[in-house]
């Protein structure tokens, strides 16, 4: 990527491919799979009926987009973003854009109220409200239903956009919104709605594409519309003034700074993998490795509830009093006293994950049949135990939350791809 960045940074290697209201897209000489996207200082509203040049916006918009895509890629979401190479430019995988704008709404406001009279502003969609709009400037981007998208038979780089593709993009749209919503919540700000777009690679892969910057959403600090930070401030101006543009630039800068925090862990989360014998180390490390994929810190310990009961409970006490959200995964076969003893003497969640053996069908009952008041669970597969721990801890850490959502999406993408191979 470093050589690609060097090539893309030279003007003689760039050829203008397309230009929109707020960005330019360039082909990169010798790099058929990549493009360079350059932000402009243009600020527009009402389909460019209102337009101003705002010095510094290009830098802020490009950095905000980079912040957002780097965060989403940290979560494991496939996107077209590759690398930021200057203050106003980034390199992306080349895609043919699907001419549909996907809008996700958590709160009813703006144009939604005009299209749906009777709905009060502030109505909350617990299940995100999704809308789609066909990108057609001449007709003010008309709203399309799923049926209209299917009926129009959109063919994007040999990929026909049908019900399965629409369903997949809906899932991706919801994931993007929910992940960014968690990021914004770190600064006590509410993500109200947002718009995104998708593209198709030459391999036929659907990717989150285009840009996601402060023109892409509504954000209300403290859930108060009067404090809004997004482009709506510009739209709401009866008359554009220098003071008004200065406020817009200030808000955009604040958004850039806040989105830079999205990729940072705000709350540590821990998984203690405790095994009854050192011979279970390989199995326990599988759990640890899987847990780390979700952004969880892990510790491996050997301790026997039968032979070193007090030592086991001392280890648990250390984690219980640390203040760090922790899940215990107990790895013990034969007569599993480890998980039940910990669960019966601690408030920490405990998951039994007994290693397989020839006598598993008999030994498993020591992990399943519990006296009253224990409250531990049992999972047989190490990767599933790690996933269960991640789900328990997801409410404490936005990155763990996002990685869990992305893992679920990848399962859905795998099923989608398997069906495509059958066609």
UniProtKB/Swiss-Prot annotation:
SMART domains in UniProt: AIRC
Keywords from the UniProt entry: ATP-binding, Decarboxylase, Ligase, Lyase, Multifunctional enzyme, Nucleotide-binding, Purine biosynthesis
EC number: 6.3.2.6, 4.1.1.21
UniProt keyword annotation of Cytoplasm present: no
GO biological processes: 'de novo' IMP biosynthetic process
Keyword Transmembrane appears in the UniProt entry: no
Region (SAICAR synthetase): 1-263
Reactions catalysed: 5-amino-1-(5-phospho-D-ribosyl)imidazole-4-carboxylate + L-aspartate + ATP = (2S)-2-[5-amino-1-(5-phospho-beta-D-ribosyl)imidazole-4-carboxamido]succinate + ADP + phosphate + 2 H(+); 5-amino-1-(5-phospho-D-ribosyl)imidazole-4-carboxylate + H(+) = 5-amino-1-(5-phospho-beta-D-ribosyl)imidazole + CO2
Positions of region (AIR carboxylase): 264-423
SUPFAM superfamilies membership: N5-CAIR mutase (phosphoribosylaminoimidazole carboxylase, PurE), SAICAR synthase-like
Sample GO molecular function, one term: ATP binding
Metabolic or biological pathway: Purine metabolism; IMP biosynthesis via de novo pathway; 5-amino-1-(5-phospho-D-ribosyl)imidazole-4-carboxamide from 5-amino-1-(5-phospho-D-ribosyl)imidazole-4-carboxylate: step 1/2; Purine metabolism; IMP biosynthesis via de novo pathway; 5-amino-1-(5-phospho-D-ribosyl)imidazole-4-carboxylate from 5-amino-1-(5-phospho-D-ribosyl)imidazole (carboxylase route): step 1/1
NCBIfam families in the record: purE
Family label: In the N-terminal section; belongs to the SAICAR synthetase family. In the C-terminal section; belongs to the AIR carboxylase family. Class II subfamily.
Name of this protein: Probable multifunctional protein ADE2
Organism annotation: Caenorhabditis elegans
Gene name as annotated: paic-1
């Amino acid at each position: 990527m470093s050589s690609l960045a060097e090539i893309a940074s030279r003007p003689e290697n760039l050829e203008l491919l397309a230009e929109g209201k707020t960005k330019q897209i360039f082909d990169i000489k010798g790099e058929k799979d990549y493009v360079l996207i350059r932000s402009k200082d243009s600020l527009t509203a009402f389909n460019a009926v209102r337009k101003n040049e705002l010095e510094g916006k290009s830098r802020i918009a490009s950095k905000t987009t980079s912040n957002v895509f780097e965060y989403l890629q940290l979560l494991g979401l496939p996107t077209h973003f590759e690398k930021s190479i200057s203050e106003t430019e980034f390199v992306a995988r080349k895609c043919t854009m699907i001419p549909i704008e996907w809008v996700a709404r958590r709160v009813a406001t703006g144009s939604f109220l005009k299209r749906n009279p009777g709905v009060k502003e502030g109505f909350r969609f617990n299940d995100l409200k999704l809308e789609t709009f066909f990108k057609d400037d001449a007709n003010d981007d008309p709203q399309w239903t799923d049926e209209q998208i299917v009926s129009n038979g959109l063919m994007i780089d040999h990929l026909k956009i049908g019900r399965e593709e629409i369903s997949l993009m809906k899932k991706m749209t919801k994931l993007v919104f929910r992940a960014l919503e968690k990021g914004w919540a770190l600064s006590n700000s509410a993500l109200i709605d947002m718009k995104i777009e998708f593209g198709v690679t030459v391999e036929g892969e659907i990717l989150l594409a285009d840009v996601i910057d402060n023109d892409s959403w509504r954000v209300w600090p403290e859930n108060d519309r009067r404090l809004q930070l997004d482009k709506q401030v510009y739209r709401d101006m009866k008359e554009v003034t220098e003071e008004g543009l200065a406020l817009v630039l200030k808000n955009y800068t604040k958004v850039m700074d806040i989105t830079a925090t999205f990729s940072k862990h705000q709350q540590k989360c821990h998984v203690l993998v405790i095994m009854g014998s050192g011979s279970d180390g390989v199995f326990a490390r599988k759990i640890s490795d899987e847990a780390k994929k979700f952004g969880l810190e892990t510790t491996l310990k050997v301790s026997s509830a039968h032979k070193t009961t007090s030592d086991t409970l001392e280890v648990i006490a250390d984690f219980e009093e640390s203040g760090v959200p922790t899940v215990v995964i107990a790895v013990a076969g034969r007569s599993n006293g480890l998980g039940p003893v910990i669960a019966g003497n601690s408030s920490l969640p405990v998951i039994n994950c007994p290693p397989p053996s020839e006598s598993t069908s008999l030994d498993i009952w020591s992990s399943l049949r519990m006296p009253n008041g224990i409250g531990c669970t049992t999972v047989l597969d190490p990767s599933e135990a790690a996933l269960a721990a991640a789900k328990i801890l997801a409410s404490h850490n936005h990155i763990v939350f996002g990685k869990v959502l992305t893992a679920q999406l990848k399962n859905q993408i795998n099923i989608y791809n398997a069906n495509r191979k059958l066609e």
